[in-house]
């Protein structure tokens, strides 16, 4: 009697998998049945299925046992059962890499490949190419050429796809089959034409001219396969992105013409390609949007989903271009497919007017509980974007988000909501109290440690600045009583910030910290003891240094420096200035609502600058330069499409700059050796040493370094322009083999000029409490001057220009200029080369142009002078 499974069993998978408890040893024992005569096709099929199942589940087969099973399986070629033979082909492909002497089946596969049974020929080709290596390929070359142009479409497709895989083993041999591939590309069969185009592109993709010619040929002659058209559109859009012609190119005209194709998949591919092209204007997007608008009313759910998802992407950059589709999108709100309805609403949230927000929020609340967490995150992202667009609607959004926060959901969903509320609080000061209240309510019953610590950190930063900070103390101390160690430690830090900034609350906070000093966890006790003693001193300087600002160094770098210090005992105390600064301030990281893996990294990963520090320290000439202060973003020194690609990264040390030149040779008939970049400075900078890249083979990047000493006599000379010339020895080589000539000749290539500016000497560091930091530094080295920015037309432009020029970190969200204001104060903080803290207060007034009063405070006189001289 067959057991009947109910629906729950079916969903959970109970009883639905007959191979669930297979054991490898038992299956290999069964494989001996292959040697029996006569062959039992039905039983052998079942055993082969078990072997394939185990292989695909990741079961490890030893070489000996795999080879034994493989040899037993080869006897099955004696059977004429079609299903068994095709299962043998599949098993050969799966066991090719784990068995020895698999080439024993070559003759059997070649026989099937050239036989009269069409049903065997295609699978035999695929299996044969799986076991063939570069030395055997020429032996089957004649058969492969014949198979590519075979009249049977399954045989031709198998040969084309196998050829594509064989290019990884022997590109040069497969390239000789290009004429056959071109013949196959004119086939009437849609799959053969698609696979032929794929092979042709793969053989020519490194030759831009050849790809362009291929595109021209097929765009003029036309194609019968919609799949091939889709591939052609993708190739064209890739070329278009690299081209300087942009949207005036014939390639763009071709993609646009595909919007009128009779196949829906081609129309969608063309629309998607246009939308994803960089720098597209609303006018150029219009035809693609019109097509997607038609798809919104399609009876096919897949088309409706594709259309609304793509329109959702367009709405992020060009909301006005999608406004014409609003009526169609509103019709999709009631779509039976919840994914389509969600995307329709989130698109409308991006394109709708301020007056439609309330209605849309009401509609989405009716079914938000029914959709998956993934789509709930999409809704939250749309709300976040809407808050930035219509700040006055923050109360509606906040209420909606708080309701979502109470619903059940996973970590990613909850994190997206928390991040969205935090971004609303940061963008709209009016929403701060209601936002903090919702977050306080959430942490009362929050199972995610990461979110609880994040919210406590926010409460410590923003809570003390609210009109009634005392109301948050209860929520924070509850965490100390009820939560795990990590959350308790975060709560202690938050309490300390309230005590440091609010004199009336200090006695209460000290009492609470004393209670925390009895905690069972070391970290919590240590924090409580440390903060209690700092707060007891009642000194602003101590509060600023140890409670407000915290560490500004790279934690990974500090760990390494401390380890090094313990290995080499010294009487000198450990100097924090030897530790590289953190390149990304901890509090500056922008809220990212894109889903990421919930698993947190177990080990601390070194950041970009820590990696550069290790790389440079390994070069003897740079070993004694001191700690790496800052590494710039890459600067491109050559145009795209030139013979050589060169970009530069500036590594700034206390008294030197190391210029790292990443060089790539794009000529396949040249090998470059002894590559250096000669630099001629315009100021008092001195070039000390060159470290050449030993060789640059075709398309393999190499690194050359130039070491420059900063001027000692004039510390304000921070800006300099270098003329750069790449010098090298050229050895011509054969493009096919890459073998170079014995002798070479010297040559050079002029690069773009390279500038060192003030921002290269300053590292961004965020000061969470700018006022306290300003008072702590004091006015010993304070400088002040007033400037007129006559060409600047708005306060926003002035703020952006100042931040970019100085390379400093905006504090107190002062980079955001309030609407309809004629004056503004910009607060900036950073660390000047050598480890000196520097703060800038810039008062801006808008009249005829912008008047700017700059006040600089620093721990040393040099940074203050440098900034005012550079600005002037």
From Swiss-Prot:
GO molecular function, one term: structural molecule activity
Location in or out of the cell: Cytoplasm; Golgi apparatus membrane; Cytoplasmic vesicle, COPI-coated vesicle membrane
InterPro entries to which the protein is assigned, alphabetical: ARM-like (IPR011989), ARM-type_fold (IPR016024), Clathrin/coatomer_adapt-like_N (IPR002553), Clathrin_app_Ig-like_sf (IPR013041), Coatomer/calthrin_app_sub_C (IPR009028), Coatomer_g_Cpla (IPR032154), Coatomer_gsu (IPR017106), Coatomer_gsu_app_Ig-like_dom (IPR013040)
Pfam family of the protein (one): Coatomer_g_Cpla
Gene Ontology terms describing biological process: intracellular protein transport; vesicle-mediated transport
Primary site of residence: cytoplasm
GO cellular component: COPI vesicle coat; Golgi membrane
HEAT repeats: 64-101, 283-320, 321-355, 356-392, 395-430, 467-504
Disulfide bond residue pairs: none
Keywords of the record: Cytoplasm, Cytoplasmic vesicle, ER-Golgi transport, Golgi apparatus, Membrane, Protein transport, Repeat, Transport
Membrane topology summary: Peripheral membrane protein
Subunit: Oligomeric complex.
UniProt record similarity statement: Belongs to the COPG family.
Role played: The coatomer is a cytosolic protein complex that binds to dilysine motifs and reversibly associates with Golgi non-clathrin-coated vesicles, which further mediate biosynthetic protein transport from the ER, via the Golgi up to the trans Golgi network. Coatomer complex is required for budding from Golgi membranes, and is essential for the retrograde Golgi-to-ER transport of dilysine-tagged proteins.
Protein name as it appears in the record: Coatomer subunit gamma-2
Species in which this protein is naturally found: Xenopus tropicalis (Western clawed frog)
